[in-house]
Amino acid sequence: MNPSTAQARVVVDELVRGGVRDVVLCPGSRNAPLAFALQAADAAGRLRLHMRIDERTAGFLAIGLAISAGAPVPVVMTSGTAVANLGPAVLEANYARVPLIVLSANRPYEMLGTGANQTVEQLGLFGSQVRATISLGLAEADGAGAGSYDQQNSVWRSAVCRVLAAARGTRSGNAGPVHFDIPLREPLVPDLAEGEAEPAGRAGGAPWTATQYATLDVPLEIDLTPDTVVVSGHGAGLRPELAHLPTVAEPTAPMHGPALHPLALPLLTPRQAIITGRPTLHRQVSRLLADPAVTVYALTTGPRWPDVSGNVVGTGTRAVTSGGPRPEWLAHCRELDEKARQVVRAELAGHPKPTGLHVAAVVMDALREGDQLLLGASNPVRDAALVATPRPGVRVLSNRGVAGIDGTVSTAVGAALAHPGRTIALIGDLTFLHDAAGLLIGRGEPRPADLTIVVANDDGGGIFELLEQGDPQYAGVFERVFGTPHGMDLAALCAAYRIPHRQVDPAELAAELAGDAHGLRVLEVITERSSLRELHATVRAKIAP
């Protein structure tokens, strides 16, 4: 068995022993030993292999698989620009704490700087964005026969266990991406006549090095007598000790206590706020947390805590509470929450044309227990937060790490592949077009059993209508440089990828979502964005006393 083949087989075997069940592979020559080993493991039913020709979409497919399954997912590619294309996915995985493993093949290191083709300084390419950068030395035969790699076997397997531990955050409490770079020397294909087994792992299929999850327990004493609100942000865990407190929860975060609509927040004067997770959505929340008159606490599970304004007075992993909220405070919050929700729905009912908010309302109303919902990082996740709270038993995902629109279609496909039930993705047209390559799934590759991608198509960037750039005084330049209309025919685009497509209105969308997709399909709703600014202003005005 040649050295590169032996090393690749050991790496793949140890990944499986370490709990890896899905791997995304991009074709190439330098990573051929890994490709052969992965194909063999897939054929043996030890893992599920997903082939993709575009490394950028492959990275986000791996993110979708990882966040839905809650397990590390390697994405394997050849050397050169193939590795650089993982940059956006690595950034997202870093800030969203997703166990993404970038397993890159490399040229032998002595080839660096020689002008050799497709050879770049890729070790360390991701810098501070990864939890660890780990490399294996070149595989070399120790001798002849079955024991020719015994000395290196332990080093290879130990390195894989370090990669998995760093990705899971077992010792740090901080899961995230890892770069695992393996230089491979020719020959890059297995010997046709070889019958030799790879160096063995531990008995019973156990990992070479077992790692236990470290537990971080930092109690934080909080008196709940002052009027308090909870802000539940992305990545938060459920906090039973906060179950009776009004909670502004992002769609991807747990609702710890009674729901509090984000648009009701400016009408309240809380004396303290408790952050769980990382808030990423609402300006009303940002203003509250920046108010020096509000005492702010942060509860997180990892080493980081959010504190954009510098107002946090204490951090911990759980709250040790004393006192309790005033009944009058709870009643006031409940009344404002109900009013905000009624106003939003009433204004949508009276609006003459469908907007992204209308589409979000239909999608949120159609969810049922066991569903998985993926929201685009632009307007869809914000629209969902305004129209409803997710139903119990519905898991909500969104790429909120750096909140880019990159790879959202691929993330949805990956999430659906890892979920046994129905998955619905709600995204905008620009997000859909930005990752249209995510629809490219090769013949014979695993495909989602039940994924509906709902595209709210307002022919451009509707979110900018609601930001400073959308002020009427900038109307002369807005449409071209912020609105960015494209006029694309999404039906034709889907047809090119052989994906079923149907254009529907909101009522038809509701009927479609009453059933299952039976595969992957796209439902497009034509919406308009020119009235979004006025609609949001009207809602805010009618909520105010």
UniProtKB/Swiss-Prot annotation:
- EC number(s) stated in the UniProt entry for this protein: 2.2.1.9
Q: Which InterPro entries match?
A: MenaQ_synth_MenD, THDP-binding, Thiamin_PyroP_enz_TPP-bd_dom, TPP_enzyme_TPP-bd
User: Has the keyword Cytoplasm been applied to this entry?
Assistant: no
Q: Which biological pathway?
A: Quinol/quinone metabolism; 1,4-dihydroxy-2-naphthoate biosynthesis; 1,4-dihydroxy-2-naphthoate from chorismate: step 2/7; Quinol/quinone metabolism; menaquinone biosynthesis
PANTHER family, per database record: 2-SUCCINYL-5-ENOLPYRUVYL-6-HYDROXY-3-CYCLOHEXENE-1-CARBOXYLATE SYNTHASE, PROTEIN PHYLLO, CHLOROPLASTIC
Q: Which family does it belong to?
A: Belongs to the TPP enzyme family. MenD subfamily.
Q: Name one Pfam family in it.
A: TPP_enzyme_N
Q: Which UniProt keywords apply?
A: Magnesium, Manganese, Menaquinone biosynthesis, Metal-binding, Thiamine pyrophosphate, Transferase
UniProt remark on cofactor binding: Binds 1 thiamine pyrophosphate per subunit.
UniProt KW Acetylation keyword: no
Tell me which species this is from. Nocardia farcinica (strain IFM 10152)
**Gene name of the encoded protein:** menD
Q: Which domain of life is it from?
A: Bacteria
Name this protein carries in UniProt: 2-succinyl-5-enolpyruvyl-6-hydroxy-3-cyclohexene-1-carboxylate synthase
Q: Which CDD domains does the record match to this protein?
A: TPP_PYR_MenD, TPP_SHCHC_synthase
Catalytically driven reaction(s): isochorismate + 2-oxoglutarate + H(+) = 5-enolpyruvoyl-6-hydroxy-2-succinyl-cyclohex-3-ene-1-carboxylate + CO2
Chain segments annotated as transmembrane: none
